[in-house]
Design a protein with these regions (language model features):
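Short, flexible, solvent-exposed loop/turn segments with mixed acidic/basic and small polar residues
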Residues: 1, 21-23, 46-51
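Mature N-terminal segment immediately following signal peptide/propeptide cleavage
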Residues: 10-38, 43
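Bacterial Sec-dependent N-terminal signal peptides
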Residues: 1-9
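Generic hydrophobic alpha-helical membrane-segment signal
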Residues: 8-10, 16, 77, 103
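Enzymes and membrane/adaptor proteins characterized by extended Gly/Ser/Thr/Asp/Glu-rich
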Residues: 36-44, 48-157
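Generic signature of intrinsically disordered, low-complexity segments enriched in small/polar residues
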Residues: 2-3, 21, 79, 107
Length: 157
């Protein structure tokens, strides 16, 4: 249940912020390019320029380390005129994209678990880890139907 005491001020902020945007800025809010947190300075500079020039709505992080992703998240949020939506494609946890975190089991393994409570706790743990590093949205779970046992992409995930 939404706490109505706090819902109205947030809604007012959203409405007033949206109304203050130009058409170009509103269009920019629709875009979320991918940024590699293990990229080089040139890669980061391009991301910063895109945030400033196109008024991006968010960033999708991929490949890197936690420290670098947190640093970039803070830097990008500081230069953006509207808070960015930070996302990852981390269907089996952040270890899918971040090198210095412990992995969770692959989806095929989780599908064999009969304990819904355990699966719920695992999902909570994944969400908590991502929240701690500033991720708002995980593009997961997904439905990958493995119709070819030799599929190198889907495999056990």
């Amino acid at each position: 249940m939404t706490n109505l005491l706090f819902a109205q001020p947030k809604q007012n902020w959203v409405d007033s912020t949206y109304q203050s945007l130009t058409l170009e800025q509103k269009i920019g809010q629709l875009f979320m390019p991918m940024v590699f947190s293990q990229g080089d300075q040139n890669h980061y500079q391009k991301a910063i320029s895109a945030i400033e020039k196109y008024h991006l709505g968010g960033i999708i992080f991929s490949k890197g380390t936690i420290a670098e992703q947190v640093r970039l998240t803070n830097e990008f949020q500081n230069i953006s005129s509207v808070p960015l939506l930070i996302a990852m494609d981390a269907e089996w946890g952040m270890a899918m994209r971040i090198s210095d975190v412990s992995p969770f089991p692959f989806q095929m393994t989780l599908g064999a678990i009969q304990n819904d409570s355990l699966l719920y706790q695992l999902g909570q743990s994944m969400a908590n880890r991502q929240r701690r590093v500033g991720v708002h949205l995980n593009f997961a779970p997904v439905v990958d139907v493995n119709t070819n046992s030799k599929n190198p992409v889907i495999g056990l995930r």
